[in-house]
Amino acid sequence: MDMVTVTAKTVEEAVTKALIELQTTSDKLTYEIVEKGSAGFLGIGSKPAIIRAKRKETLQDKAIEFLEQVFDAMNMAVDISVEYNETEKEMNVNLKGDDMGILIGKRGQTLDSLQYLVSLVVNKSSSDYIRVKLDTENYRERRKETLETLAKNIAYKVKRTKRSVSLEPMNPYERRIIHAALQNDKYVVTRSDGEEPFRHVIISLKRENRRDRNDRSDRNEK
């Protein structure tokens, strides 16, 4: 965080100059007094006030600083942008650069791990829980669309075969996408089973539909 040294007639004037120079507000400024200054006698022997000031480190600053350290260690040039909605307590972090596939990893596992670490860093300094979403190349939306398509295709298979299907293990966010995609389906039901990190979604026929289909199958056999 950049620090500035400001000189003025009084500490109050020095603080005002620091606010202007740092383009911030008083609630986001921290400073230390180097010299209080004095008016002297009839202007003789007066000393200026001197302060060192800097902007208070925000949650966005903490997220960026942590990620910069990670990418420096990985020898990667990544552009980091952070948007924080203080009302909703949500932070969206977007990453841009070359070869972002390395940061995404298999089925987004590396991106999820990095998101978890950023969340730890941010929430360590916050009295309220901040929901952190880390994304690159619109991966989250593309993955959401893929999972929604998968859910509908598996639901069709379940209706056709009348057999439950267990999906591969997914993180809580991805499981919620599957549940949401099929919550209004009249014929199938979803549930999560197992323990992390192997917890997965099972898609099955609703019981009334299973009984109805069995009854119709029995009648067809007669």
Curated annotation (Swiss-Prot):
Keywords: Cell shape, Cell wall biogenesis/degradation, Chaperone, Cytoplasm, RNA-binding. Residues 54-133 form the KH domain. It comes from the Bacteria. It is found in: Cytoplasm. InterPro entries: Jag_KH, Jag_N_dom_sf, KH_dom-like_a/b, KhpB, KhpB_N, R3H_dom, R3H_dom_sf, R3H_KhpB. Belongs to the KhpB RNA-binding protein family. Forms a complex with KhpA. Homodimer or homotrimer. Has an N-terminal Jag-N domain and 2 RNA-binding domains (KH and R3H). This is RNA-binding protein KhpB. It comes from Clostridium symbiosum. The gene is khpB.
